[in-house]
Amino acid sequence: MAYDRLLERLYLVDNDWIVKGATALLARDLAVRATIDVDVYRQASSREIAEAELREAAGRDIGDWFTFEIGERRTLSEAADGFRLPVKAFIGTAAWAAFHVDLGGDELHVTGEPEAVPALARVVMPDVEQHGYLVYPLVDHVADKVAAMFELYGVDGAPSTRYKDLVDVVAITIAASLPAELQITAIQSEATHRGLRLPERFTVPDLQLWGRGYAREAGRSLLPIARTLDEALAVVSPCLDPLLDGTARGNWDPEQRRWVKSSLTE
């Protein structure tokens, strides 16, 4: 509820904001992990301008009894090109929720088009409107997560431990359709952007490490299947392998769990 009320205010200031991260998956009914962050960005806008708009939005009274306090920003530890701002939400004088807003500017690399989705929580109040959000393209969401799992981190080039990304890819694979051509383009573009050479078959950088880490992350999630790494790889490989080797055609069918050519492309 608090996320939605802050986002509603933000869209009243500017309607070009894009919701990313776990909140975007939640808005698509694809989320299986809890989050205390709202990840947003606006193209063609510096982070400083974006922060000013966020603070302006938080101060608006739109008749829903919510008020917000925005704390001091800090640089994101995993990505120095973003800000994190703590937020406290109140109803009247009572504290309601505390979360963070991760704020990006115009550096984001996007292949697809942002998509409109309904509001997270429906509010039934006289004269209170909900307009929904624009969310990060799903093909770019997948591309980001795939690339992040292959990227090396730190000065020593440590392998990725982003187990949560594999949890999210499993959730997307079993519930969402993906267009092959655009998804291939998004993955290749993201790999180029990060300076990565991706393999033609999906795997994780360290089977033993990821076996333990993924099982912990999946155990905390709402995934209905794939609680072990082997099970997760069995679920995502039919989707990701044809994307990585460029042979995927048509659309990913989450029910059949295979790439299906349309009648126009057969």
Tell what function each PLM region has:
Residues M1-W17, L26-V38, R42-E266:
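Structured mid-to-C-terminal alpha-helical surface segments
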